[in-house]
Amino acid sequence: MIVWLASYPKSGNTWVRLFLNSLLNDKTNEVDINNIQIRQFPLRYDFSNLNINMDNIQEFISNCIVCQDKINLDNSIKIFKTHNAFWKAGNNQFTNEENTKGVIHIVRDPRNIITSVKNHFSRKNYDEALKFMTDEKKSLGSRTKKKIQIC
């Protein structure tokens, strides 16, 4: 089962992953930002055995749950970082209750996050950043409304 570590970009997700990684996995008390066992989902690797066009949002989203089903075959709890929301594209969802054990939702003070969104998404000013943040047609973590964040 998957526990999602979900947040806006620049909200402390990496810090929380380092903390959880140290708590759950790393007994050496050494923190290595380049060796965090809690990784991003989705990665292109997750879809490597599927013959799909990763740039086609419908093909991609219709296979997210297929990939999560494979990840969950051993029934162990896994934590994945994501900037994607619990959303649908057509009749397909990013995830579902069968694959999800829970969510850790990192929330940052909105007075700080608008600055991060402005810089992260290269918005010209705070008004443009606010418009981007409140646009229901935008997919968090994407540069356009037709793509989601895939690493």
Locations of the language-model features?
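PAPS-dependent sulfotransferase catalytic domain
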Residues: 1-151
